[in-house]
Amino acid sequence: MTTILAIAVFGAVGCVARYLLAGGVYALAGRAFPWGTLAVNVIGAFLIGLIMEAALRTTLMSQELRLGLTIGFLGGFTTFSTFSYETFKLLEDGEFFSASLNVLASVALCLVGTWAGIMAARQL
């Protein structure tokens, strides 16, 4: 039961964090390109690499905390569904370059983010 509670609490925090961060990015950069979604997904990719690698290398992180952070917080913070919707809308609006850029940038930057998180955890 503590694992489910950890996932729920961390998930709620992740959702609010995504709302605030993405909203802030959109306020600065506008909505012509899905910068807010890209930002939260890249940050989330970095954090999953950091957390999972750190969890593999130490016994200091309990299973409840690891699952709360990864499934809960990062599950609420990152958003593949919004990425998909925003990319579809770009395609529907004839913004083929922006849609392609969003797909390529999301995949490439998220992979680099995950790698950077893993490398950072290995330095701890």
UniProtKB/Swiss-Prot annotation:
<keyword id="KW-0997">Cell inner membrane</keyword>
<keyword id="KW-0915">Sodium</keyword>
<protein>
    <recommendedName>
        <fullName>Fluoride-specific ion channel FluC</fullName>
    </recommendedName>
</protein>
<feature type="binding site">
    <location>
        <position position="75"/>
    </location>
    <ligand>
        <name>Na(+)</name>
    </ligand>
</feature>
<keyword id="KW-0479">Metal-binding</keyword>
<dbReference type="GO" id="GO:1903425">
    <property type="term" value="F:fluoride transmembrane transporter activity"/>
</dbReference>
<dbReference type="GO" id="GO:0062054">
    <property type="term" value="F:fluoride channel activity"/>
</dbReference>
<feature type="transmembrane region" description="Helical">
    <location>
        <begin position="4"/>
        <end position="24"/>
    </location>
</feature>
<keyword id="KW-1133">Transmembrane helix</keyword>
<dbReference type="GO" id="GO:0046872">
    <property type="term" value="F:metal ion binding"/>
</dbReference>
<comment type="function">
    <text>Fluoride-specific ion channel. Important for reducing fluoride concentration in the cell, thus reducing its toxicity.</text>
</comment>
<keyword id="KW-0812">Transmembrane</keyword>
<feature type="transmembrane region" description="Helical">
    <location>
        <begin position="101"/>
        <end position="121"/>
    </location>
</feature>
<feature type="transmembrane region" description="Helical">
    <location>
        <begin position="68"/>
        <end position="88"/>
    </location>
</feature>
<dbReference type="GO" id="GO:1903424">
    <property type="term" value="P:fluoride transmembrane transport"/>
</dbReference>
<keyword id="KW-0472">Membrane</keyword>
<dbReference type="GO" id="GO:0140114">
    <property type="term" value="P:cellular detoxification of fluoride"/>
</dbReference>
<comment type="similarity">
    <text>Belongs to the fluoride channel Fluc/FEX (TC 1.A.43) family.</text>
</comment>
<feature type="binding site">
    <location>
        <position position="78"/>
    </location>
    <ligand>
        <name>Na(+)</name>
    </ligand>
</feature>
<keyword id="KW-1003">Cell membrane</keyword>
<dbReference type="InterPro" id="IPR003691">
    <property type="entry name" value="FluC"/>
</dbReference>
<dbReference type="GO" id="GO:0005886">
    <property type="term" value="C:plasma membrane"/>
</dbReference>
<keyword id="KW-0813">Transport</keyword>
<dbReference type="Pfam" id="PF02537">
    <property type="entry name" value="CRCB"/>
</dbReference>
<feature type="transmembrane region" description="Helical">
    <location>
        <begin position="32"/>
        <end position="52"/>
    </location>
</feature>
<keyword id="KW-0407">Ion channel</keyword>
<keyword id="KW-0406">Ion transport</keyword>
